[in-house]
Amino acid sequence: MQISNSYLQLGDDFYLPSTPRQPSNPQLFLWNQGLAESLGVADFLAQEQEDPAGFFSGGRLLPNSKPVALAYAGHQFGHFNPRLGDGRAHLLGELRGDTDMVFDVQLKGSGATPFSRGGDGLCGLGPAVREFIMSEAMAALGVPTSRTLAVVTTGDEVYRGDAVPGAVVCRVAASHLRVGTFEYFYAQGNKDAIERLCDYAISRHFPELASSEGPEKYSGFLRAVFSRQVELVCEWLRVGFVHGVMNTDNTTISGETIDYGPCAMISTYNPNTVFSSIDAMGRYRFGHQPSIAHWNMARLTECFLPLLDQDSKQATAIGESLLGEFPQNFEQRYHHMLASKTGVRLQGDSDKALCEDFLQLLRKQGLDYTNSFDSLTRSLIDPQHEDRCASQWPEWYQAWSARIEQQGRPREVVAEGMRRHNPVVIPRNHHMEAVIDECIKNGSPDAAKSWLKVLRRPYQDLPTTPNYQDPPADGDRSYQTFCGT
Ligand SMILES: Nc1ncnc2c1ncn2[C@@H]1O[C@H](COP(=O)(O)OP(=O)(O)OP(=O)(O)O)[C@@H](O)[C@H]1O
Ligand SMILES: [Mg+2]
């Protein structure tokens, strides 16, 4: 295990040195052994006979770590803030994983930094447990995401209305480059920094662009970032994830999900679903996420206008044309995803319509998204589910069965294919709240660990899976999530 600090070479405009806060009594709460092994952290700890709690709470520094808080700006709910930055996070450095990819290792909740703007720099145990469970569930679902290596309780209290136990999350991500990182320099008119940042992003995420130059490099870069966002949002829609705070400072260049603050899962299918208490206008509602990703990509494109062409009119035309590809690319990828969930091969518009009709039925009947697709998948190989689906959706199910038959693949094969896109279990909101409450009340991670066993196999029926499949009694109508906790 060798920590590197490549980000620091970008120059001191990009970050501010900041030392994590000393916790009074760091205790390991949750630990991701698989991730620790893949990063060489497990071997390091075994060799040194060290406990992870000190290193992953900020109490002690890993060898060669030079902690910094990263500078970034961001559009929050549409309004630009030129200076946000890591107000409660410390980048410890980078580690090379067993697949040779390089990952950032960052602490969150590790104390105030020069970017804290009056905030306390801390994190409560509840949100830390949420970040661990959600990110690990998303990774197991196959959704691009930052990971969580550890949650360490600090032994200190954090004030969030009441006193709550404090914790530090250790996050591992392909990088922490955000759209807001580019916006930070664009707002300062620092074209040179944007060029350097772009080269750095290419070296970490898009090495295939390394040999391109000039405007071609920049349009290639934008296309590559757009494509990752298209993929990411399609994956969110596939599993029913609502990010909740898709500000440009929470939008990564790598295309990974980051910041599990006010996120939630839909139960009843409704594109207008919004859970975040501060999202009064529903800007970040479930079905609006593709448009917001597009809007965020427009903010990124703006930062590149001076680099796309010297003539500003020409540059705007190039930017608009690149952005114009986004909705079409999204539609195409989305229909493909929906068809995979529905088991249909897309051979024409009538296949698209068949898949969309199913969503309309779920909406009209107020049905659970995950369980309905699960039942549809099972109906191909289980007569009980077949009867249930046939009576729930008489006309549609007949049309669908006929189409599946017509497309000529054996039912078992179609069911297997659908299963890869339809989880049997997701991190449902009511279970999340119950598990977090239990962890805090008992001062024990056991409830989280039992749930994680199931969430790490979201496409399989384990003996304890049924404990977590029930939709919320009220369809989550009164469920609310909160930011900045
Ligand atoms: N308790 C806090 N103290 C200081 N700064 C904070 C605190 N909570 C949030 N911030 C800062 O406010 C901004 C927006 O917060 P947001 O909730 O999006 O991020 P976050 O959850 O802290 O971190 P990340 O995006 O890295 O997951 C960020 O600059 C963040 O560092
Ligand atoms: Mg954030």
Swiss-Prot record:
Active site: D249
Catalytic activity from the UniProt record: L-seryl-[protein] + ATP = 3-O-(5'-adenylyl)-L-seryl-[protein] + diphosphate; L-threonyl-[protein] + ATP = 3-O-(5'-adenylyl)-L-threonyl-[protein] + diphosphate; L-tyrosyl-[protein] + ATP = O-(5'-adenylyl)-L-tyrosyl-[protein] + diphosphate; L-histidyl-[protein] + UTP = N(tele)-(5'-uridylyl)-L-histidyl-[protein] + diphosphate
UniProt keyword terms in alphabetical order: ATP-binding, Magnesium, Manganese, Metal-binding, Nucleotide-binding, Nucleotidyltransferase, Transferase
Enzyme class: transferase
Protein residues bound to Mg(2+): N250, D259
Region Disordered: start-end pairs: 462-485
Pfam families: SelO
Binding, ATP: G85, G87, R88, K108, D120, G121, R171, R178, D259
Cofactors that this protein relies on: Mg(2+); Mn(2+)
Record flagged with keyword Manganese: yes
Any one GO molecular-function label of the UniProt entry: ATP binding
EC number: 2.7.7.-, 2.7.7.108
HAMAP family recorded: YdiU_SelO
Function description: Nucleotidyltransferase involved in the post-translational modification of proteins. It can catalyze the addition of adenosine monophosphate (AMP) or uridine monophosphate (UMP) to a protein, resulting in modifications known as AMPylation and UMPylation.
Family the UniProt entry places it in: Belongs to the SELO family.
Name recorded for this polypeptide: Protein nucleotidyltransferase YdiU
